[in-house]
UniProtKB/Swiss-Prot annotation:
It is found in: Mitochondrion. The keyword Ribonucleoprotein applies. Keywords: Mitochondrion, Ribonucleoprotein, Ribosomal protein. The gene is RPL1. GO terms for molecular function: RNA binding; structural constituent of ribosome. InterPro entries: Ribosomal_uL1, Ribosomal_uL1-like, Ribosomal_uL1/biogenesis, Ribosomal_uL1_3-a/b-sand, Ribosomal_uL1_CS, Ribosomal_uL1_mit. Gene3D superfamilies: 3.30.190.20, 3.40.50.790. GO terms for cellular component: large ribosomal subunit; mitochondrion. GO terms for biological process: translation. This is Large ribosomal subunit protein uL1m. Belongs to the universal ribosomal protein uL1 family. It holds the Pfam family Ribosomal_L1. PANTHER family: 54S RIBOSOMAL PROTEIN L1, MITOCHONDRIAL (PTHR36427), LARGE RIBOSOMAL SUBUNIT PROTEIN UL1M (PTHR36427:SF3). The keyword DNA repair does not apply.
Length: 224
């Protein structure tokens, strides 16, 4: 069901909670969606520039102030011996990539130390399609051992990839019904601010068609 009505974000979340009042599935996800117009610029150069905004955004990850969902699994690619990193789910080098390739393990993130990132180039065809190729923007290429632990802790708290689909849409889960309204609202507002700060004002005004809030099984509300 889709309700094409304009609401402020607070009202939209309250309406979704009311809609799901008698539903026992409290794991239903609250989702925020962004819809961007395909550029109508006649300049090929401008088309490339504007498409680049979303391309760059799609390389980033975002951490919500209020954690929800299952803690992500993290794999570390390294040939070094490291101690005191029991919070890492999988550690290895070529053997680790083999397990990822044959789906023996399915980590949410693959991290690597900066001085070893070159060793992963030959595995780009394996890691790329799975969305596991480490990048600095996603925080999965780590400068040194000193910040490795803090990087793992940040990812474990729930760092979500921003994915832009072929229709120029972004859909991200921002919480579930086990959370209180204030927590959901804080997550939504932090995501809105994050994306707003990474897109030029001129692009948002001309290309951001709508923002909506919905849930796994339920109505959608366009927010203003």
């Amino acid at each position: 069901m889709s309700l094409q009505e304009f609401h402020n974000v607070e009202d939209a979340v309250k309406l979704l909670k009311c809609y799901n009042l008698n539903d026992k599935n409290l794991d239903s996800k609250i989702i925020v969606g962004f819809v961007f117009n395909k550029t109508k610029s006649i300049s090929k150069k401008r088309v490339k520039i504007e498409q680049g905004y979303l391309t760059e955004l799609g390389k980033e990850s975002f951490s919500f102030p209020n954690f929800f969902g299952k803690s992500p699994e993290i794999a570390l690619f390294t040939t070094k011996k490291l101690d005191n990193f029991s919070t890492i789910d999988y550690v290895g080098s070529d053997d680790l990539i083999k397990k990822i390739e044959d789906n023996s393990i399915k980590p949410n993130y693959l991290i690597v130390l900066k001085d070893e990132v070159g060793s992963l180039a030959k595995y780009s065809r394996v890691l790329g399609p799975k969305g596991l190729m480490p990048t600095p923007k996603q925080g999965t290429v780590v400068e040194n051992n000193n910040i490795l632990l803090s990087t793992i802790e940040t990812l474990k708290k729930g760092s979500f990839r921003i994915k832009v689909n072929k229709y120029n849409m972004i859909q991200m889960s921002v919480g579930n019904l086990t959370m209180n309204t204030d927590q959901i609202l804080e997550n939504i507002k932090s995501l809105l601010l994050y994306i707003q700060n990474r897109l030029p004002v001129s692009y948002r005004k001309t290309s951001l068609k709508k923002i909506y809030v919905t849930m796994t099984h339920g109505p959608s509300f366009i927010i203003n």
